[in-house]
């Protein structure tokens, strides 16, 4: 934004300060700040470590609050002091000071807009690691190939974002692509940033598997769930689950498992099936599979509660888990479009190489 006068600069500097204070109040950040102070004092108490479990919980909650608040602390004083800086500089330099202050205003405004997006990630689970599952729809090789393309798109995004990820389950397709894949993603606000990817992703292209070079439409569903802490009580009855062990079905090579260490858990009441095969240890794979099941059951309970609330309030959901959220058109033109936000780009190659942050941010702005 180009600031044209000292009068305008004074006005927008005060607006920025007011917007920051309003957002701080709206998000109850002062309460969070007090909670962080209390947790920090607890963490510094040597007696806390007499109870390792309590110490772990205090440390975890403290770290989560720090992740949430530190971006606000970083910019808070600069924004609150900016109107005074404007007054002092303009008193000294007059209109000649507008240029240098204009660039500082733009920097602060940009940082504040980033904070507003983080403010949309206000649920506790938004801070958590995430499980991302990719599952092709009907269509055989065509949709399985599309699933593998999406798997690459997401892994490239994680690499650019600085997120750690591991492929904890993958099932090879029939000749090409994949039948199923699950990723474990760790990073700041991992679930918060990825939750908007829930839904059906549609591809339109000339099929490389069709000798007649006809145009095909393929569908893949993406499901994202947060990793749930041990302190959240999700009861899983032994009688409600079936545990199967099997040999890893990954891409192969020198590190392929030659023992039945992969684990699949079926939760019979809900029909939820989870699997993990990335570790050589059956015990570790079982632990990860149970974490995934716990995450899915927690999410199921959250959905039920949300639906019940919507029934009581008379609200109607516009978007369901099975909704088509985004189209990727390779032919007869190049376009990727999100149907919830109308955000779009013609640079399909960049999107498929992991450039999906603009789509994610556009979705977060709607929350």
Swiss-Prot record:
One of its GO terms (molecular function) is translation release factor activity, codon specific. It comes from the Bacteria. Methylated by PrmC. Methylation increases the termination efficiency of RF2. The keyword Protein biosynthesis applies. Coiled coil: none annotated. SUPFAM superfamilies: Release factor. One of its GO terms (cellular component) is cytoplasm. Pfam families: PCRF, RF-1. The modification N5-methylglutamine is found at residue 254. PROSITE patterns: RF_PROK_I. It is found in: Cytoplasm. Keywords: Cytoplasm, Methylation, Protein biosynthesis. The keyword Protein biosynthesis applies. Gene3D superfamilies: 3.30.160.20, 3.30.70.1660, Release factor. Belongs to the prokaryotic/mitochondrial release factor family. Peptide chain release factor 2 directs the termination of translation in response to the peptide chain termination codons UGA and UAA. This is Peptide chain release factor 2. It comes from Leptospira interrogans serogroup Icterohaemorrhagiae serovar copenhageni (strain Fiocruz L1-130).
